[in-house]
Amino acid sequence: MTQFGLLMFATEYAVAPQVLAQQAEMYGFESLFLPEHTHIPASRKSPWPGGAELPKEYWHTFDPFIALTMAASVTQKLKLGTGISLVTERDPILMAKQVASLDHLSDGRLILGIGAGWNAEEMENHGTPFARRWPILRERTLAMREMWCQEEPEFHGEFVDFDKIWCYPKPKQAGGPPILMGASSRYTYDRIAEYADGWMPIYQNRARRQASGGVDYAAGIAKTKEAWQARGRKGSPQFSIFGVGADRRAVAELVELGFDRVIFSLPSDAADVVLPLLEKYASIAHEFTS
């Protein structure tokens, strides 16, 4: 059965993440996802993939792990996700600790959406060369896996290199939280099969998908499964999609395509604007879960 979640840029001017989380759980949503940007360089050289003027929530968003900790503290079952976390801008040892701590304290409710990012200047302010972001993401993710799974992890790569260490706590979920890849290039599916657990693309409407450069979701799901089997991975990859609006026909299509989780998009706004939308989204979700 398809699960339904919510995504919002958590900012200082929006409804508090703990308030949103409580309401999300009350309405029966399975998950809450929060995006990440540490900052946005004022030069604005890198064009926003959304095409229009970059919304201000991109440089006002809270740290997702801190905001999700607040959400975890007031809920019991709601899964807590990053949508997405920019691993390319984080120290892997520190991030492994943060992820494991939150997963442990939330009793195994974390979902780790990851990506390499699109803002070259933002990334380079963290010391990450934009052209090398994908190899760096790969090594940092593999290194975190080692820290979550091994008693004395060590890792020796081009970008991450450390001898045996002691690093606790381990995540509550064995092997760490599920890692969902937020990308849609032709390389995405092999990357998922190597070091992630599923695919989490951004939603595009049918017209956008049919245009040049649009994402073919059916093909993406099929290619992910094919790469998964070629790697000899056990089980099945997970398929989530985020940024969906209040469109019943779109949701029906995504469910039919085989997405395990559909994540509705909320504006970064005050409670009196955001919370009424939960009832609308919940009514749509109910049609596919009842």
Regions found by a protein language model. Give the residues of each.
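Active-site-adjacent structural elements that line small-molecule/cofactor binding pockets in enzymes
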Residues: 1-290
